[in-house]
């Protein structure tokens, strides 16, 4: 696969996009030696690793080589682990890839996107606000026009994440940097300033209590015998398979189904996702294309699961917080022709990740090492739901669910 062996991780490594990571110390002592040599060695190692193992290197070759050039001149004294990680995080920013991330953090680390974000921007316009988030509670609305992030004008906010400095940035880099800046840093108070009728309105995103669902899966029989199941960021939990099985049994007899994947920013794994899809299959079916860097492409299969097949029409709800394996499950339902997907563009996390450990710092890192695609060939991160509707409407009405219910009502006539 490349020059580092995947899988040599520190205990407690998180799934891509998850918020929980092992924190590092950021307090240097008087006797702390200069950690620059180890940091520089791992920066060079990361540069080489991306060249050999990163699935999207060719599309980012120029910007990555610019970031890796003259590293000894760019790395100053490093006195603690937080500063070590900061050097490597800044280097990794050059990839402008939210699916490439470290498996640890410090108090000065950037928050991850999408799991650490609670609103999404296209240009200066808010296109999604995460339900129940601090942004939703603060009053941020889909359609708001943002004029500052954390007190900085948008161009200045983007500059905090654009790397390397002194080069020209394309539209994709700027779009990534804008949403990364909106997620902010762990040590930085967050706010967003929007243009309102009465003038600029700065909304603080601090000191809000955000409730986390306690159940892996939420299930309910909606009027009209529509079985509704929502995954609560649980595609990486082995226990989700049994919880989903129980939810299906609870809703047995539903005439139609809604599978809500709008809260899956942390991704997950196929051992959980395939049994979920399998409940709705009558035979083994291809659901996702895998495109390794150095092997022929092949199609991932899912098999029937659960002892009985769920009949009836299926709607899958997705949005900006549908990430990684959540995206794979959405394109799987579409590719298997077993579900109609409603919502907005998803998190657009490209490829499938492998896990590595850098040799000198021991920091775990995850990089997309192979591409993934819809069975019909569209790269997963470029695929768009056929039924477009606002998926993440903050504290407003659930427009995607309303659209799904209306469509299912028409379908039954």
What residue ranges belong to the model's regions?
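Positively charged n-region of N-terminal signal peptides that target proteins for export
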Residues: 1-4
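Bacterial N-terminal signal peptides
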Residues: 7-17
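Flexible, low-complexity junctional segments that flank or bridge functional domains
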Residues: 19-256, 263-265, 356, 364, ...
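Short, well-structured beta-strand/strand-turn elements
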Residues: 99, 337-350
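Solvent-exposed loop/turn segments at secondary-structure junctions
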Residues: 132-134, 153-154, 210-212, 233-237, ...
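Loop/turn elements at helix/coil->beta-strand transitions in domains of secreted/extracellular proteins
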Residues: 225, 253-257, 311-314, 337-340
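Gly/Ser/Thr-rich loop/hinge elements
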Residues: 265-317, 321, 351-362, 369-375, ...
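Low-complexity, Gly/Ser/Thr/Pro-rich intrinsically disordered linker/tail segments
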Residues: 388-413
